């Protein structure tokens, strides 16, 4: 029997081959059509998807302007720091927040709870930006960047630093974490100090590195700010105020020093103060600039204005003698601390005679005294431009009783700030010329408005020299071999119910040198409790 071998031979079928070629060519054609459609006819959607993955718009930071004193010494500067942020969408696409050593290291460095961070990212899976930490020092930020955590990036920013620490802190104020001023000069001049950030459109690779700058709008630079403050005088003023408040066991204090010929503020101190570089232990009360916000009745510091008004109205002459016996008005006894049957105008200031100025006030229409107070600066803001400044309070009455008119002459019935009182004494030092105040440096000459004849102010300013001499109430303000013209004052405080309480405000105001005044100074002690509460 013969065995047949079955041999499978390859067979060629033209029809099958043709169909295969048609299929291959058809697929290639479809691919080419699709590529042509995407690349030529309708590329926008593909480009949009690519841009969504790689294009990022970033702010171009502008450094906050520097604040300096009148000599150019820096008082507030910006230092470079970094912000750490996360792109939750990118992080989730790459596995989310992990619990490995790199994530643990970042969490420990930034004092973050890793579980809370993971929950935060998972609750915003499509977000593209969340802050993890702000104002981190660059060295720490660079170390975190080297961990190469998915979706975690750095952003350059700046933080405010105050080289002089607590010096002028209540005046300068401070900024928030976004570098926006929220207190003091930082807030009042925020627009000038911030400038305008720029924007740039960049393309990034999958690691977050910039590979192309598309467009950029440059930032508008911020302006620097030169204050009228002299850092050295500010330091001396603050040290003296701190010592005075502590020695007098006062609740708080304020002091203002003005350059008379320009109206520039050379020093403005408040106690208590704080360190703006570390505000953790400070209270809201520590932030107050008491020189512009606290109000009180000025007491005897207004007596020079009463005498000027009486001289201007011709009620008395510079050499007049006034009856200063105690007397009764509306059932209230008007008397002095000491007994003086009669005093000259100089004596009224030296002994701070309430009876003397009461007689002068009662001898003229009260409106004349109101006009003088207003002309010298009481009852309205100084125009310094600082946020939080009080306008004080000037009474508006239809009827003035004799007692009201008398007490108005020794500083009761109106409210003023330390800054307003300093402005008044700067006007006295300017021999009747009221100049606008300035917290920024300006150059003389500064024009002012005459509010009282020079001869009258000069005469009263000379009388004020007696207050610091033996027998006067301001001997503590005396400076050896140096002429000063001062006036002290004391007033009872008003309680929350609007009634006087057994607490006092004491103050000393004056100008120096008396022969040709260059500086006006006011010091206020709020509720001194170390024995005497009188100013001086």
Positions of PLM-derived features:
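Beta-lactam-recognizing serine transpeptidase/beta-lactamase-like catalytic domain environment
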Residues: 76, 204-216, 255-300, 305-529
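Periplasmic/cell-envelope proteins involved in peptidoglycan metabolism and beta-lactam response
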Residues: 1-279, 367-379, 496-499, 526-536
């Amino acid at each position: 029997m013969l065995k047949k071998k079955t041999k499978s031979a390859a067979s060629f079928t033209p029809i099958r081959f043709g169909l295969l070629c048609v299929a291959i060519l058809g697929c290639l054609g479809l691919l080419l059509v699709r590529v042509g459609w995407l690349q030529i006819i309708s590329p926008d959607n593909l480009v949009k998807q690519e841009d969504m993955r790689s294009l990022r718009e970033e702010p171009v930071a502008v450094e906050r302007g520097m604040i300096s004193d009148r000599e150019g010494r820096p008082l507030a500067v910006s230092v470079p720091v970094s912000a750490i942020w996360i792109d939750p969408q990118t992080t989730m696409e790459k596995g989310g927040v992990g619990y490995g050593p790199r994530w643990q290291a970042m969490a420990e460095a930034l004092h973050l709870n890793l579980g809370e961070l993971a929950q935060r990212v998972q609750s915003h899976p499509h977000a593209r930006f969340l802050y993890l930490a702000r104002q981190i020092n660059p060295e720490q930020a660079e170390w975190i960047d080297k961990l190469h955590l998915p979706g975690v990036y750095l952003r350059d920013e700046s933080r405010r630093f105050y080289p002089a620490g607590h010096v002028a802190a209540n005046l300068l104020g401070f900024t928030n974490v976004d570098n926006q001023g929220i207190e003091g000069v930082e807030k009042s001049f925020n627009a000038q100090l911030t400038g305008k950030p720029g924007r740039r459109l960049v393309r990034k690779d999958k690691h977050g590195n910039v590979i192309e700058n598309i467009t950029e709008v440059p930032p508008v630079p911020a302006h620097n700010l030169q204050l009228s403050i002299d850092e050295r005088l500010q330091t001396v003023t603050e040290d003296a105020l701190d010592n005075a408040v502590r020695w007098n066991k006062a609740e708080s204090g304020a002091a203002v020093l003005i350059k008379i010929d320009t109206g520039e503020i050379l020093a403005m101190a408040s106690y208590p103060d704080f360190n703006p570089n570390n505000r953790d232990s400070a209270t809201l009360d520590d932030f107050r600039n008491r020189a512009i916000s606290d109000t009180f009745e000025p007491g005897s510091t207004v007596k020079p204005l009463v005498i000027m008004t009486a001289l201007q109205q011709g009620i008395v002459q510079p050499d007049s003698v006034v009856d200063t016996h105690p007397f009764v008005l509306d059932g209230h006894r008007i008397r002095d601390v000491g007994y003086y049957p009669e005093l000259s105008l100089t004596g009224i200031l030296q002994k701070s005679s309430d009876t003397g100025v009461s007689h002068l006030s009662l001898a003229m229409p009260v409106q004349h005294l109101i006009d003088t107070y207003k002309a010298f600066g009481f009852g309205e803001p100084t125009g310094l431009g600082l946020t939080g400044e009080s306008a004080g309070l000037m009474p508006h009455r239809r009827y003035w009783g004799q007692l009201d008119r008398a007490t108005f002459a020794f500083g009761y019935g109106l409210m003023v700030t330390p800054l307003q009182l300093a402005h008044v004494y700067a006007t006295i030092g300017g021999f009747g010329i009221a100049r606008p105040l300035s917290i920024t440096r300006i150059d003389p000459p500064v024009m002012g408005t005459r509010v009282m004849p020079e001869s009258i102010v000069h005469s009263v300013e000379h009388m004020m020299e007696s207050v610091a001499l033996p027998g006067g109430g301001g001997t503590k303000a005396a400076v050896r071999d140096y002429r000063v013209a001062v006036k002290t004052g004391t007033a009872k405080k008003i309680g929350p119910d609007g009634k006087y309480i057994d607490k006092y405000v004491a103050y000393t105001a004056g100008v120096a040198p008396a022969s040709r005044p260059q500086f006006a100074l006011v010091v206020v002690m709020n509720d001194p409790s170390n024995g005497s509460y009188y100013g001086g």
